[in-house]
């Protein structure tokens, strides 16, 4: 019996009965992930609580936001973030696109907007400092994500990977990665795909450590974040 959350006709669906590929890094990478995630949650718990309060009291809405992403072997999971957008964000975005065709083209090609009308005041600060992604430490502990790896994508984005999608699917999506330390939104999507492919093809635990350490100045300087 197939165990998956998507239709068998989906291009990136990999049924478990075919012998799904184990994620890169094996037990050493998984042990590294769990250790770092637990230590980070403990160390950052005061900041975690502070952000929760800021998000809640800024507009009274929900604290967390979960969006379906494609994970290892094509299985979907709910990627967690602190909510940075208005609760009626989808409607706001569609109205914005009607009068801003250039913004729609930016969204269509990059899945990002430099001036996103949905983002709240508190949310813009959280995004700039990448604090909105802290809840993904819980995704890591649950085994849905890794500390280092390709950033989680939606199905439409994975189609942009074309033949390189197979490399994305070999790894758990990461909290950080080559893309984050190399300019993030300042680089093209094709370059992002190339980074992800290179990472998976050349994975090592040492490389993960280097990326983690390089993430700290990248986040502090807000390189390519918006």
Curated annotation (Swiss-Prot):
Key words, A-Z: Cell membrane, Exopolysaccharide synthesis, Membrane, Plasmid, Transferase, Transmembrane, Transmembrane helix
Upper lineage: Bacteria, Pseudomonadati, Pseudomonadota, Alphaproteobacteria, Hyphomicrobiales
InterPro entries hit by this protein: Bact_transf
Function in brief: Needed for the addition of the first sugar (galactose) to the isoprenoid carrier. May function as a sugar transferase.
Recorded topology in the membrane: Single-pass membrane protein
The family this protein is said to belong to: Belongs to the bacterial sugar transferase family.
GO molecular function: phosphotransferase activity, for other substituted phosphate groups
GO cellular component: plasma membrane
Protein name as annotated: Exopolysaccharide production protein ExoY
Subcellular location per the Swiss-Prot or TrEMBL entry: Cell membrane
Main location (coarse class): membrane
Alphabetized PANTHER family for the sequence: COLANIC BIOSYNTHESIS UDP-GLUCOSE LIPID CARRIER TRANSFERASE, UNDECAPRENYL-PHOSPHATE GALACTOSE PHOSPHOTRANSFERASE
Pathway: Glycan metabolism; exopolysaccharide biosynthesis
Gene Ontology biological-process annotations: polysaccharide biosynthetic process
Domain of life: Bacteria
Transmembrane regions: 34-54
Pfam family, one: Bac_transf
